[in-house]
Amino acid sequence: MKAAKKPRTPGPKEGLSSTVTEPNRSVGNPSFRRPPLDEVVFGIRFEPLGNFTIPFFGLLWQKFRSEYPRVEHAPPLTAGTTLAVDAASGAPLPRLWFVNESDDELVQFQVDLLYYNWRRREKEYPRYPMIFPKFEGAKNSLESLLVELAQDPIVIVAHELTYINHIPQGQGWDTPCRRRCTSCA
C-alpha cells in the first residue's frame, strides 16, 4: 500500500518554482473579444542581489536596449519596510524602467524585482500567449547577465500577475458604493 503524499505548504521561499508556465486554456476561462484590459504585469520578487552595483544596471540595459531603447527612473518599490541601498554610499538603489519605442511595453528592474508590463496604447491586447514570452525573455536576460558577471543566481520569493481593467461608468456599473454593500442607494 502506498503512503499518501503529504500536501505541500509553500512558505516564503519553499515551494516556489523559478519556472512559470502558461495557463491551461481548456479549463473554460472566459475570453472576451474586446477585454477592458488596460495593463498586464508579470513579475517576480527575489532575494536582493547583494553585489549588483550601479554599473551593472547599465550592463543590464545593454541586454534590453534593442527592444527597450528608453530608460526612465522610478521610485524603488518595497516589500515591507526594507529598501535596498548601496553598501558604499547608503543611497537607495534605483528602480529602472526600460521602455519600448511605442510606449506599450516596459521592463522594470531593481535589485529585488523584475516586472514586465504590457500597457494599452494604440494596439489591442495581444493576449497572454503573446506577451508571457516577453517576460520570460527579460528574466532570461537578467539570469544570463548574472552568469556573465559570476553573480549568484536569483532566488525567487514571489511570482506576481496583475491585470488592470478600465471599465467606464455605465458599462457594468453605475454608482460607486461608499461602503461594502449588496446594493447602492
Positions of predicted regions on the chain:
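Glycine-rich, often proline-containing surface loops adjacent to acidic residues and nearby aromatics
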Residues: P36-I44, L106-Y125, P153-H166
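Short amphipathic alpha-helical segments
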Residues: F52, F56, L60, R127-K134, ...
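Secondary-structure boundary elements
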Residues: P133-V155
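"Short basic amphipathic alpha-helical interaction patches in structured regions
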Residues: Y128-K134, A150, P176-R178
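Aromatic/basic-lined ligand-recognition segments
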Residues: P10-T19, V27-N29, R95-S102, L106, ...
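N-terminal ordered "arm"
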Residues: G11-T81
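Long, hydrophobic/aromatic-enriched structural stretches that serve as scaffold segments
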Residues: V71-Y128
